Amino acid sequence: MSNSDLFESNMYKEVIKQYDEVTEFINLDSNIRERLKLPQRALTVTFPFRRDEYDEVETVIGYRVQHVLSMGPTKGGIRYASNVNLGEITALAILMSWKSAIVGLPYGGAKGGVAIDPTPLSKQEKQRVTRRYTAELLPVIGVDKDIPGPDLGTDEQTMAWIMDTYSNFVGSPQPGIVTGKPASLGGSITRREATGRGVVAIANAALDKLNLKYENSTVVIQGFGNVGRYAALDSYERGAKVIAVNDLGGAIYNNNGINIPELFKHIAKNKSVKDFDGADNFDDEILEIECDILIPAAVGGVIKSSNAENIKAKIIVEGANSPTTLSADKILRDNGVLLIPDILANAGGVTASYFEWVQNTQNYLWKEKELHDRLIDVLTSAFEEVWIISEKNKVDLRTAALIKGIKKVAAAKLTRGLFP
């Protein structure tokens, strides 16, 4: 059995396949090449959990993976989902390393997860899971060690419980232990919208390269959580036509553009985009609608070889993590679709988290405009660097982004040397 067999999963295989192709292309030293395929730390924990309505005790499994410790503290979200596994968490931690390096953040990548479906949990049940999971992570997390944040199935309330649990163990308030927490506890006022607005900023930078204008574009958004809804709002505010969106409840379409502020009001009342008066319900595949910009902002693996040929977008901006499979990626490139990869396109979230962490550690809050301006500057500068790498090496943007991220992480590893 090889070392990598410990982290077996389809997502891990895809991440390593991409990594192997890029490291072969840049001729990365074979010693460091093998080391970066594996995390430096991978913690598996089990703990008891009792539901509200009966006394039977369940055993819950959780993970925290830290990929690289050479860049600074590690950073990455915590997800709650029934299908969470070590391979998936490891793959996501590796991607966080590349993502942080691409936008110039002083972090290594990390990721955590609990294998439990959060949907049926009461608030008290979710709190018990969170506090016990946090207690199990105490040896490996810390303000200068590893800083969690929200992800699938977790939110700012989850982060508040983690902060409170950790602070009680340490004996003093520790707001910097997590990011993505409520503003009342030192959370960033822009964190919730940062990923979505960052996606649009990156898309706008790409359109500039093509001598196109965002305000003249049509936009389709798959997924209407935080990323999708703020990408939609920013697109609307820039004058683009958002012609289709969807969520778990259904999809809507209006060729003349959807009024996004009015859609927000509809969602507040009806909990879904479906049946919005300003658009038609839509039953066909939303990813295949003809548009200028397609933003997949839901889950991974939605663009695959079976539907890639049918995609009619000019530009795809990956708001979700790993929405495009490797096989689909090649088909899209061959068809002339410009694809901006997740490790660049959705880096607004981790960038805003970094700003939150800096403010917490300095006990000094920045104003909203300063946060927004810094976010856009970081993301557009990173895009410019990746574009130059792409042009220079005649490679697609995903490969160019990986070249930038992997080279930076490898350089830090090699410069620090071996211990002992």
Predicted regions and their residues:
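Glycine-rich phosphate/diphosphate-binding loop of Rossmann-like nucleotide-binding domains
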Residues: 179-182, 187-290
